[in-house]
C-alpha cells in the first residue's frame, strides 16, 4: 500500500516491524465489527423539525463493505444508539449482523456470535471510549480507529485511518485487510 498505516502505542518496534505485524494481523481477519456514529458517519446527528433523524454515510464505504462481503469477510454493526436510518443502511448493504442500542458492545458481539458471526480473528473499528469493551473482546485481534477519534482510542488502536470518521474510512480498512490476504482485486 502506498498509504502509511501505523501501529500506535508503546510497541518498542521499528516502523518496519510494526508494518509487518499489522500486515500479519490484517491477514488473519475473518470479520469486521463496525461502530456507526463517528466511523460510518461523521458523528453528527441531524434531527428534522418533524422528529426525523438524518445521518450522512459515505458511498465509498458502502462499496468497500460490499467488496469485503464478496471476499468472504463477515460484517457486523454494533452501535450504542437505536436508529431506523442505521437499519436501512445495513439492509441496503446486505449486513445481517446488526445490534443497536448496545450499552455493552462486547456483550452485543457475544450475541452476534451466537447467531453465527465469526468468533475469532475479528477487526473492530470504533472512535470513542465506549468502544473499549469491544476492543478488549477475546475475538478481536485487530483494533482500528479513525483519524479524529478520542485520544485514548488513538493510543490503543493498532490501525488508524488517514481519513476522518464518515469520510470513507472503510475504504482504507478494506484495502489493508484484502491486500494482506492477497485478495485485493484492483492491482
Question: Model segments located where?
Answer:
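Short coil/turn segments at beta-strand junctions that form active-site/ligand-binding loops
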Residues: 28-30, 73, 120-121, 141
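Asp-based phosphoryl-transfer active-site loop
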Residues: 28-44, 135, 170
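Short secondary-structure boundary segments
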Residues: 36, 80-81, 102, 147-149
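Amphipathic coiled-coil/heptad-repeat helices and related helical stalk/stem segments
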Residues: 15-18, 61, 105, 128
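A positional/architectural concept
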Residues: 40-70
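Non-catalytic pre-domain segments flanking phosphatase-related domains
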Residues: 1-34
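Substrate-recognition element of Asp-dependent hydrolases with the DxDx(T/V) motif
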Residues: 65-89, 135
Amino acid at each position: 500500500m502506498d498509504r502509511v498505516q501505523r501501529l500506535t502505542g508503546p510497541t518498542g518496534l521499528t516502523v518496519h516491524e510494526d508494518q509487518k505485524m499489522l500486515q500479519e494481523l490484517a491477514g488473519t481477519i475473518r470479520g469486521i465489527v463496525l461502530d456507526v456514529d463517528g466511523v460510518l458517519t461523521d458523528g453528527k446527528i441531524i434531527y428534522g423539525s418533524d422528529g426525523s433523524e438524518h445521518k450522512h454515510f459515505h458511498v465509498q464505504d458502502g462499496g468497500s463493505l460490499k467488496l469485503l462481503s464478496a471476499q468472504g469477510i463477515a460484517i457486523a454493526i454494533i452501535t450504542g444508539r437505536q436508529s431506523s436510518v442505521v437499519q436501512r443502511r445495513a439492509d441496503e448493504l446486505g449486513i445481517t449482523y446488526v445490534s443497536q442500542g448496545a450499552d455493552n458492545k462486547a456483550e452485543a458481539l457475544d450475541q452476534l456470535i451466537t447467531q453465527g458471526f465469526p468468533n475469532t480473528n475479528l477487526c473492530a473499528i470504533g472512535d470513542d471510549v465506549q468502544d473499549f469493551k469491544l476492543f478488549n473482546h477475546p475475538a478481536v485481534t485487530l483494533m482500528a480507529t479513525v483519524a479524529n477519534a478520542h485520544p485514548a482510542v488513538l493510543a490503543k488502536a493498532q490501525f488508524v485511518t488517514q481519513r476522518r470518521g464518515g469520510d470513507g474510512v472503510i475504504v482504507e480498512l478494506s484495502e489493508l485487510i484484502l491486500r494482506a490476504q492477497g485478495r485485493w482485486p484492483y492491482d
